[in-house]
Amino acid sequence: MLKIGSHVSMSGKKMLLAASEEAVSYGATTFMIYTGAPQNTRRKPIEELNIEAGRKHMEQNGIEEIIVHAPYIINVGNTTKPETFQLGVDFLRMEIERTSALGVAKQIVLHPGAHVGAGADAGIQQIIKGLNEVLTPDQTVNIALETMAGKGTECGRSFEEIAKIIDGVKYNEKLSVCFDTCHTHDAGYDIVNDFDGVLNEFDKIVGIDRLQVLHINDSKNVRGAGKDRHENIGFGHIGYKALHHIVHHPQLTHVPKILETPYVGEDKKDKKPPYKLEIEMLKNGTFDEGLLEKIKAQ
């Protein structure tokens, strides 16, 4: 079975149940959530996440595994502000606890961090320090380090940087990788013409067994732009053919594929989610040039 889904919202009273219902409405077989708003630290207590009803709904609809994304505000790469680093460490610990409580997620996707001017090496050392403070040998969920586009002072823009972080962490069996197609493309990897070559390079430097999550996004920018702006499937510089190849790659059949493509529409208050039609299109093997119009008409 193809494990494919998108980012969905976990909110209101229904929480995990609402997320599962949204995912199922898209024809998804997995999904990704934030356990609260990605841009702040406000979180509902675990008892209010409606876990039991959510898990039951998932089971009824054949969804076995989901992904959690850590909030953007976590930056364990910060060497200049001890309070920012500490917030990141404390909050990551809390996210591990919350994700464990869900019982259906094995991976927490984390943007490794930004060095905020101290240099990549200093940032990487700080990320290692933070992860060493957070990870324990008995935790049941992994931290999936996301491949980054290289925007600003982001660490993790190359496979070498990801490998350096992993190598420095004591309990690194608790680390995996989330491979983001838009980010890797924007960082300069040729996933359009030579994805197999890129995957081989990843295997040599990091190890393909670490690749446990895929973010499937097209890119608004040319390869190597270092920008990180997602585009709808087939409408960017990566293109449908390359993304379809990645989604159906024989070495990655077990890996959940998560779409984070933009909502569609000119009216900011009435943008439509693209995921149902994008998932269908990635399953059926044919690019639909009229997709965006169909999404708007939903």
Swiss-Prot record:
The keyword Endoplasmic reticulum does not apply. Zn(2+) 2 binds at residues 146, 180, 215, 260. The keyword Hydrolase applies. Gene3D superfamilies: Divalent-metal-dependent TIM barrel enzymes (3.20.20.150). Its cofactor is Zn(2+). Its EC number is 3.1.21.2. SUPFAM superfamilies: Xylose isomerase-like. Binds 3 Zn(2+) ions. It catalyses: Endonucleolytic cleavage to 5'-phosphooligonucleotide end-products. One of its GO terms (biological process) is base-excision repair. NCBIfam families: nfo (TIGR00587), PRK01060.1-1 (NF002196). HAMAP family: Nfo (MF_00152). Endonuclease IV plays a role in DNA repair. It cleaves phosphodiester bonds at apurinic or apyrimidinic (AP) sites, generating a 3'-hydroxyl group and a 5'-terminal sugar phosphate. Belongs to the AP endonuclease 2 family. This is Probable endonuclease 4.
